[in-house]
Design a protein with these regions (language model features):
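Helix-turn-helix
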Residues: 36-40, 44-82
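Helical hydrophobic small-molecule/effector-binding pocket
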Residues: 113-135, 184
Length: 227
Protein backbone atom coordinates (compact mmCIF):
# COMPACT_ATOMS: atom_id res chain seq x y z
CA UNK A 1 0.00 0.00 0.00
CA UNK A 2 1.52 3.38 -0.96
CA UNK A 3 2.46 5.60 1.95
CA UNK A 4 0.28 8.60 2.69
CA UNK A 5 1.61 12.11 2.09
CA UNK A 6 2.12 12.51 5.83
CA UNK A 7 4.15 9.30 6.08
CA UNK A 8 6.20 10.26 3.04
CA UNK A 9 7.00 13.62 4.58
CA UNK A 10 7.96 11.99 7.86
CA UNK A 11 10.28 9.50 6.16
CA UNK A 12 11.64 12.02 3.68
CA UNK A 13 11.08 11.98 -0.03
CA UNK A 14 13.54 10.66 -2.60
CA UNK A 15 15.43 13.97 -2.71
CA UNK A 16 15.79 14.11 1.07
CA UNK A 17 16.95 10.50 1.21
CA UNK A 18 19.48 11.14 -1.55
CA UNK A 19 20.80 14.17 0.33
CA UNK A 20 21.14 12.10 3.51
CA UNK A 21 23.03 9.44 1.58
CA UNK A 22 25.39 12.04 0.13
CA UNK A 23 26.05 13.53 3.56
CA UNK A 24 26.76 10.09 5.01
CA UNK A 25 29.19 9.30 2.18
CA UNK A 26 30.96 12.62 2.64
CA UNK A 27 31.20 11.98 6.38
CA UNK A 28 32.73 8.58 5.74
CA UNK A 29 35.25 10.05 3.29
CA UNK A 30 36.24 12.71 5.82
CA UNK A 31 36.69 10.09 8.53
CA UNK A 32 38.80 7.94 6.23
CA UNK A 33 40.93 10.91 5.20
CA UNK A 34 41.43 11.87 8.85
CA UNK A 35 42.50 8.34 9.76
CA UNK A 36 44.91 8.21 6.82
CA UNK A 37 46.46 11.49 7.97
CA UNK A 38 46.74 10.17 11.52
CA UNK A 39 48.50 7.03 10.27
CA UNK A 40 50.83 9.17 8.16
CA UNK A 41 51.75 11.18 11.25
CA UNK A 42 52.44 8.02 13.26
CA UNK A 43 54.61 6.62 10.46
CA UNK A 44 56.53 9.89 10.28
CA UNK A 45 56.90 9.93 14.06
CA UNK A 46 58.34 6.41 14.14
CA UNK A 47 60.92 7.32 11.51
CA UNK A 48 61.90 10.70 12.96
CA UNK A 49 61.94 9.59 16.61
CA UNK A 50 64.06 6.56 15.70
CA UNK A 51 66.51 8.65 13.71
CA UNK A 52 66.79 11.77 15.88
CA UNK A 53 65.28 10.94 19.25
CA UNK A 54 62.00 12.21 20.69
CA UNK A 55 63.46 15.39 22.18
CA UNK A 56 65.04 16.52 18.90
CA UNK A 57 61.86 16.27 16.83
CA UNK A 58 59.38 19.16 16.72
CA UNK A 59 55.73 19.20 15.77
CA UNK A 60 56.77 21.15 12.67
CA UNK A 61 59.10 18.28 11.74
CA UNK A 62 56.29 15.76 12.17
CA UNK A 63 53.84 17.82 10.17
CA UNK A 64 56.30 18.42 7.33
CA UNK A 65 57.09 14.71 7.07
CA UNK A 66 53.37 13.92 6.86
CA UNK A 67 52.57 16.75 4.46
CA UNK A 68 50.79 19.09 6.89
CA UNK A 69 51.73 22.14 8.95
CA UNK A 70 52.88 21.82 12.54
CA UNK A 71 49.68 23.31 14.02
CA UNK A 72 47.60 20.89 11.93
CA UNK A 73 49.02 18.04 14.02
CA UNK A 74 46.77 19.25 16.86
CA UNK A 75 43.74 18.18 14.84
CA UNK A 76 44.81 14.60 15.49
CA UNK A 77 46.88 14.68 18.71
CA UNK A 78 47.08 16.84 21.84
CA UNK A 79 50.82 17.24 21.34
CA UNK A 80 54.09 15.47 20.61
CA UNK A 81 53.91 13.35 23.75
CA UNK A 82 50.45 12.16 22.71
CA UNK A 83 51.90 11.10 19.34
CA UNK A 84 54.53 9.02 21.12
CA UNK A 85 51.90 7.49 23.38
CA UNK A 86 49.62 6.58 20.50
CA UNK A 87 52.54 5.07 18.59
CA UNK A 88 53.68 2.75 21.39
CA UNK A 89 50.20 1.92 22.67
CA UNK A 90 49.03 1.01 19.17
CA UNK A 91 51.92 -1.34 18.53
CA UNK A 92 51.59 -2.91 22.00
CA UNK A 93 47.91 -3.64 21.37
CA UNK A 94 48.70 -5.04 17.93
CA UNK A 95 51.29 -7.40 19.41
CA UNK A 96 48.96 -8.72 22.09
CA UNK A 97 45.96 -9.07 19.78
CA UNK A 98 48.09 -10.73 17.10
CA UNK A 99 49.65 -13.10 19.61
CA UNK A 100 46.24 -14.12 20.93
CA UNK A 101 45.02 -14.83 17.39
CA UNK A 102 48.11 -16.90 16.63
CA UNK A 103 47.74 -19.06 19.74
CA UNK A 104 44.02 -19.55 19.13
CA UNK A 105 44.71 -21.07 15.71
CA UNK A 106 46.17 -24.32 17.08
CA UNK A 107 46.08 -26.53 20.15
CA UNK A 108 49.57 -27.92 19.50
CA UNK A 109 52.10 -26.02 21.67
CA UNK A 110 55.02 -26.44 19.27
CA UNK A 111 52.96 -25.20 16.34
CA UNK A 112 51.77 -22.27 18.47
CA UNK A 113 55.36 -21.43 19.41
CA UNK A 114 56.48 -21.55 15.77
CA UNK A 115 53.70 -19.16 14.83
CA UNK A 116 54.49 -16.82 17.70
CA UNK A 117 58.14 -16.70 16.64
CA UNK A 118 57.21 -16.04 13.01
CA UNK A 119 54.80 -13.33 14.14
CA UNK A 120 57.47 -11.62 16.25
CA UNK A 121 60.05 -11.85 13.47
CA UNK A 122 57.63 -10.30 10.98
CA UNK A 123 56.99 -7.48 13.44
CA UNK A 124 60.69 -6.85 14.09
CA UNK A 125 61.62 -6.83 10.42
CA UNK A 126 58.62 -4.70 9.50
CA UNK A 127 58.82 -2.10 12.28
CA UNK A 128 62.43 -1.65 13.41
CA UNK A 129 61.87 2.08 13.93
CA UNK A 130 59.12 1.47 16.48
CA UNK A 131 61.37 -0.93 18.39
CA UNK A 132 64.11 1.70 18.46
CA UNK A 133 61.68 4.31 19.75
CA UNK A 134 60.43 1.97 22.48
CA UNK A 135 63.96 1.23 23.66
CA UNK A 136 65.14 4.83 23.70
CA UNK A 137 62.11 7.01 24.37
CA UNK A 138 59.85 4.96 26.64
CA UNK A 139 60.65 7.31 29.54
CA UNK A 140 59.16 10.23 27.59
CA UNK A 141 55.68 8.71 27.81
CA UNK A 142 53.24 9.98 30.40
CA UNK A 143 53.03 7.84 33.54
CA UNK A 144 49.58 6.66 32.45
CA UNK A 145 50.81 5.57 29.02
CA UNK A 146 53.88 3.91 30.53
CA UNK A 147 51.67 1.84 32.82
CA UNK A 148 49.36 0.81 29.98
CA UNK A 149 52.21 -0.13 27.65
CA UNK A 150 53.82 -2.19 30.42
CA UNK A 151 50.55 -4.02 31.10
CA UNK A 152 49.97 -4.82 27.42
CA UNK A 153 53.53 -6.02 26.91
CA UNK A 154 53.54 -8.02 30.15
CA UNK A 155 50.41 -9.83 28.96
CA UNK A 156 52.12 -10.52 25.63
CA UNK A 157 55.13 -12.03 27.41
CA UNK A 158 52.87 -14.19 29.58
CA UNK A 159 51.21 -15.51 26.43
CA UNK A 160 54.61 -16.84 25.37
CA UNK A 161 55.28 -18.22 28.85
CA UNK A 162 52.00 -20.15 28.80
CA UNK A 163 52.91 -21.78 25.49
CA UNK A 164 56.45 -22.56 26.67
CA UNK A 165 55.09 -24.10 29.87
CA UNK A 166 53.20 -26.66 27.79
CA UNK A 167 56.47 -27.63 26.08
CA UNK A 168 58.56 -27.53 29.28
CA UNK A 169 56.15 -28.52 32.06
CA UNK A 170 58.96 -29.13 34.56
CA UNK A 171 60.66 -25.78 33.99
CA UNK A 172 60.12 -22.88 36.37
CA UNK A 173 58.01 -20.02 35.02
CA UNK A 174 60.78 -17.52 35.81
CA UNK A 175 63.18 -19.38 33.51
CA UNK A 176 60.57 -19.58 30.77
CA UNK A 177 60.00 -15.85 31.12
CA UNK A 178 63.74 -15.27 30.83
CA UNK A 179 63.80 -17.35 27.63
CA UNK A 180 61.00 -15.27 26.18
CA UNK A 181 62.73 -11.98 26.99
CA UNK A 182 66.06 -13.25 25.63
CA UNK A 183 64.30 -14.28 22.42
CA UNK A 184 62.74 -10.84 22.05
CA UNK A 185 66.20 -9.34 22.47
CA UNK A 186 67.62 -11.57 19.75
CA UNK A 187 64.80 -10.93 17.30
CA UNK A 188 64.20 -7.24 17.97
CA UNK A 189 67.82 -6.09 17.97
CA UNK A 190 68.95 -7.75 14.75
CA UNK A 191 67.13 -5.62 12.13
CA UNK A 192 68.27 -2.36 13.72
CA UNK A 193 71.85 -3.45 14.41
CA UNK A 194 72.37 -4.67 10.86
CA UNK A 195 70.86 -1.52 9.39
CA UNK A 196 72.91 0.74 11.67
CA UNK A 197 76.10 -0.82 10.30
CA UNK A 198 75.20 0.35 6.81
CA UNK A 199 73.85 -2.93 5.42
CA UNK A 200 70.21 -3.20 4.53
CA UNK A 201 68.77 -6.45 5.84
CA UNK A 202 66.62 -8.52 3.50
CA UNK A 203 63.58 -9.89 5.30
CA UNK A 204 63.51 -12.77 2.83
CA UNK A 205 66.87 -14.06 4.06
CA UNK A 206 66.87 -12.75 7.63
CA UNK A 207 63.45 -14.09 8.60
CA UNK A 208 64.20 -17.82 8.38
CA UNK A 209 67.55 -17.38 10.16
CA UNK A 210 65.98 -15.48 13.05
CA UNK A 211 63.12 -17.95 13.33
CA UNK A 212 65.50 -20.93 13.40
CA UNK A 213 67.75 -19.37 16.05
CA UNK A 214 64.82 -18.30 18.22
CA UNK A 215 63.17 -21.72 18.09
CA UNK A 216 66.45 -23.43 18.97
CA UNK A 217 66.79 -21.26 22.06
CA UNK A 218 63.18 -21.67 23.12
CA UNK A 219 62.95 -25.43 22.68
CA UNK A 220 66.37 -26.42 24.06
CA UNK A 221 66.36 -28.43 27.24
CA UNK A 222 67.90 -26.56 30.16
CA UNK A 223 71.31 -27.90 31.14
CA UNK A 224 71.73 -28.98 34.73
CA UNK A 225 74.34 -27.13 36.76
CA UNK A 226 77.28 -29.22 38.01
CA UNK A 227 77.15 -30.04 41.72
Amino acid sequence: VPASNGAAAANGGPEAQAAQGTQAAQGTQRSQAKELRRQALLTAAASLFAKNGFNRVSLEDLGAAAGVSGPAVYRHFRGKQAVLGDLLLTVSRELLEGGLRVVAETTDPLAALRRLVAFQVDFALGKPDVIRVQDRDFSNLTEKDQAEVRTLQRNYVELWVEVLARLHPDTDAAELRMRAHATFGLINSTPHSVRSHGRKIAARSAGPVLESMALAALTAEASQASP
